[in-house]
């Protein structure tokens, strides 16, 4: 399974309604940027949202993923920002 597919699979396992935009920033598969929209972020501070995502990725954060930039939004925030 490609790393991109595994990232999406794991995030959606933790946040089943998640809509994920994922971009490989370097082409090498180790630096990623993700925009994740989920109702599961409702009522959570940004750091709690990030912990949820990093927790879902588990050991991938200690191996193939060297860096991950996150933007985590609720559906309302996504709508307000035009996403």
Regions inferred by a protein language model and the residue ranges of each:
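Short loop/turn motifs enriched for small/polar and acidic residues
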Residues: 25, 37, 71-75
